[in-house]
A protein has these predicted regions:
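Terminal low-complexity "docking" segments
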Residues: 1-126, 130-178
């Protein structure tokens, strides 16, 4: 069983909230028009207003998977393999708690779209690029990691060698597993 197939099976376990995908549209041939919106029950650009329109073909997008059927599995596996997406999982809700809403997860990731350089100049932060996220996470301190992970249990992506890479927060430290 491949690492992706094993991960997909885990996502289907009872009590698991629907996973999300962070998609870096900058690498999608044909731009935003070619994004696989039909596998998501909610899907939005992480930029808003004029910026979302102006940069729609290179912007980050967040989608919550509508199902874990074969079509969604194939699309997610393809996005991961082409280094265009990061699979985001949430922890199972405790007791009668509900998992965070799409709006809450969307707001959480929007917080990281802009960072400030050494001279206070705002800069776009492409944290959603699967080719760099692990290296970015490795330089964050404990508080920054706690803030970044927020409601997220795991980030799953394909490494440079194609192997699945899982990132999580464990005791305030980044844990990376291949």
């Amino acid at each position: 069983m491949s690492a992706f197939t094993e991960l997909w099976s885990q996502l289907k376990q009872p009590g698991q909230p629907a996973p999300y995908m962070l998609i870096d549209c900058a690498g999608v041939e044909g731009g935003a028009e070619r994004l696989p919106r039909d596998i998501f029950d909610e899907f939005e650009c992480l930029f808003t207003g004029d910026l979302a329109e102006e940069l729609e073909d290179v912007a980050p997008y967040l989608g919550r998977l509508a199902s874990l059927g074969p079509e969604a599995q194939a699309v997610v596996e393809d996005l991961l393999a082409r280094h265009l997406g990061i699979l985001v999982t949430l922890p199972p809700p405790a007791g009668s708690d509900e998992p965070p809403s799409f709006s809450q997860v969307h707001r959480h990731f929007r917080k990281f779209n802009v960072v400030y350089g050494p001279e206070g100049k705002p800069l776009f932060f492409r944290y959603y690029d699967p080719r760099v996220i692990v290296d970015v996470l490795k330089v964050l301190d404990e508080q920054q990691l706690i803030s970044f992970f927020g409601p997220v249990a795991w980030l799953c992506l394909a490494g440079a060698d194609g192997c699945m890479v899982h990132c999580t927060l464990a005791a305030g430290q980044l844990a990376v597993r291949e």
